Amino acid sequence: MATTQFPHHYDVALAWEGGHDGTALTAGPRPRIEGGAPPEFDGKDAWWSPEHLLLSSLSLCLMTTFQAVAGKAGLPIRHYDSRAEARLDRTPTGLGFTGLVLHVTVKVGSADEIERARHLLIKAKSHCIVANALMPPVHLDASVAAE
């Protein structure tokens, strides 16, 4: 059952056994995630890196926020998919993200709903907790079409 009481609290545990092996991330009853450095920093390609987890969080946050906003507006969504990209580069203060882009494709039931869905995507981005926590600002590249 959803609650609107605030504040909400979230907890993640990390266990590292030393060496250059990955770590295990756990959060209550959720599946364990094996993570570590990305290949660019001598990690393994099979590990979930902090960078990939951040983009996953951004993608999932926008989708769930859009579902909530569209649901409250009474707009049925037929299909949603997204792909997130980040550019990591040297900055005056060290390594940092210099670009974050979310490519989103949405399908609605009719052409009459396309502009409404675009508006609701923009609204969802403005309410997305993860997007609001990131620097630089997230660029939304949205494509909405009717089925």
Identify the residue ranges that each predicted region occupies.
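Active-site-adjacent loop/helix segments that line or gate small-molecule/cofactor pockets in enzymes
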Residues: T64
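Extended beta-strand/beta-hairpin segments
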Residues: M1-S56, Q67-E147
